[in-house]
């Protein structure tokens, strides 16, 4: 990289995208301790008494009159469960009992048979993670651990025991009750994991067809969900402001379109301030409680390095979220269209770490740090944002615009479904720093499922040209991309790293922003 101080006079040429380099461990698997090479345990037999309970509420009457007198009436189960049992045959190298949807995903994943045989548990981990509907929140609250002892890995999918709770306080039990959803018709490479519940509503759980009582239980759950949605809408009405946003804001100009809504710029009539307004169609939001959570969190998070929430309105089923507008666009435009020097990268990393230190101090994990979610002001200000509500501002013709929410920035402990905390954001920041160097994250050209496998088994990715980076920058990256979470730097610690002392003034980003805008105009 060049430290050319004349950047303002002549912006550098846009970088040419190169294929991702896959890190090789020379046969050594950093996560071998977590993913045993032995065959997975055999499928445990179902317990007989379960069928007796089913017969009680399924309408069977043979020989049941006497028993009905002896025992109280048993209601249908409130949490019907469709358990998946998957095994692996080390001799044939084939999985047994794998759901058809998973098998299809695996066939198109480009994970080789050798890789599957080498680490079958890692394959199951990433399949379950990729197909899980628990990856649904972007801003998440977390509880600081009282003890250092967390589970070292996820249990095998055919284990009967319950999984130890993660540090993150999200309801992960729900996904254990649902079978893998049907593969969406759109290409997997463009699918957003974080917005999967918005783009592809998860189908109802698949139960045993002969259990009428279970079907009734599912109907009961659906009614309960509908009632909960009504309660959520009522709660939302107590949070938003009263009024018509079309009267308070004028000069609406569409700048983005997403799966469940649209992003506009507009002008505040009273203040003359330009704002960004996200118009969200709540009918396309199956998890409306997440919207309440995000609004409440954003209302509390006021920080110079976070795009500020301004107001919200509810008009019918349309939610309008008003946010601070930054005209410089996303960092993605800069990293894909220009070349950044180390001092400019240091400036961006410092600003993002300041935002993360604030979030983590308030027990919030962002969990989606990437260049797409870093917005720039024309004067060079750097702010974290989250457009997970509905739309992405990046133009649709851009290759990167389809990659929002994909797994390339995820920390290994997230992919392998271990307990995790705020340091997942630090890993993602390290991946974003690689973006600023190379124009893309590692494994971008891989199938998303194989990318997850490589993250889980390879760990720290390798740079394409590490010799071009200064030792101090490489050390910063190593601190961010440390596999051992305990050794990985925190936001507070990394703010003291010598690399950040190299940072140029934020105004040095303005020429890059201008150059990126010009390059994007010429590409249209």
UniProtKB/Swiss-Prot annotation:
Composition bias type Basic and acidic residues, residue spans: 67-81
Keywords from the UniProt entry: Acetylation, Allosteric enzyme, Apoptosis, ATP-binding, Cytoplasm, Disease variant, Growth regulation, Host-virus interaction, Kinase, Lipoprotein, Membrane, Myristate, Nucleotide-binding, Nucleus, Phosphoprotein, Serine/threonine-protein kinase, Transferase, Ubl conjugation
Superkingdom, natural source: Eukaryota
Residues marked Cleavage (site): 212-213
Binding-site list for ATP: 255-263, 278
Modified residues (N6-acetyllysine): 62, 128
Domain CRIB: 74-87
Family: Belongs to the protein kinase superfamily. STE Ser/Thr protein kinase family. STE20 subfamily.
Modified residues (Phosphotyrosine): 139
Regulation: Activated by binding small G proteins. Binding of GTP-bound CDC42 or RAC1 to the autoregulatory region releases monomers from the autoinhibited dimer, enables phosphorylation of Thr-402 and allows the kinase domain to adopt an active structure. Following caspase cleavage, autophosphorylated PAK-2p34 is constitutively active.
Residue numbers of N-acetylserine PTMs: 2
Gene responsible for this protein: PAK2
Protein name, per record: Serine/threonine-protein kinase PAK 2
Region (Disordered): 1-81, 143-164, 169-188
Reaction(s) catalysed by this chain's protein: L-seryl-[protein] + ATP = O-phospho-L-seryl-[protein] + ADP + H(+); L-threonyl-[protein] + ATP = O-phospho-L-threonyl-[protein] + ADP + H(+)
PANTHER family in alphabetical order: NON-SPECIFIC SERINE_THREONINE PROTEIN KINASE, SERINE/THREONINE-PROTEIN KINASE SAMKA-RELATED-RELATED
Role: Serine/threonine protein kinase that plays a role in a variety of different signaling pathways including cytoskeleton regulation, cell motility, cell cycle progression, apoptosis or proliferation. Acts as a downstream effector of the small GTPases CDC42 and RAC1. Activation by the binding of active CDC42 and RAC1 results in a conformational change and a subsequent autophosphorylation on several serine and/or threonine residues. Full-length PAK2 stimulates cell survival and cell growth.
Mod. after translation: Full-length PAK2 is autophosphorylated when activated by CDC42/p21. Following cleavage, both peptides, PAK-2p27 and PAK-2p34, become highly autophosphorylated, with PAK-2p27 being phosphorylated on serine and PAK-2p34 on threonine residues, respectively. Autophosphorylation of PAK-2p27 can occur in the absence of any effectors and is dependent on phosphorylation of Thr-402, because PAK-2p27 is acting as an exogenous substrate.
A GO molecular-function annotation: identical protein binding
GO cellular component terms, semicolon-separated: cell-cell junction; cytoplasm; cytosol; focal adhesion; glutamatergic synapse; nuclear speck; nucleoplasm; nucleus
Record keyword Metal-binding present: no
Tissue: Ubiquitously expressed. Higher levels seen in skeletal muscle, ovary, thymus and spleen.
GO-annotated biological processes: adherens junction assembly; apoptotic process; bicellular tight junction assembly; cardiac muscle hypertrophy; cell migration; cellular response to starvation; cellular response to transforming growth factor beta stimulus; dendritic spine development
Region feature Autoregulatory region, mapped onto this chain: 69-137
Active site: 367
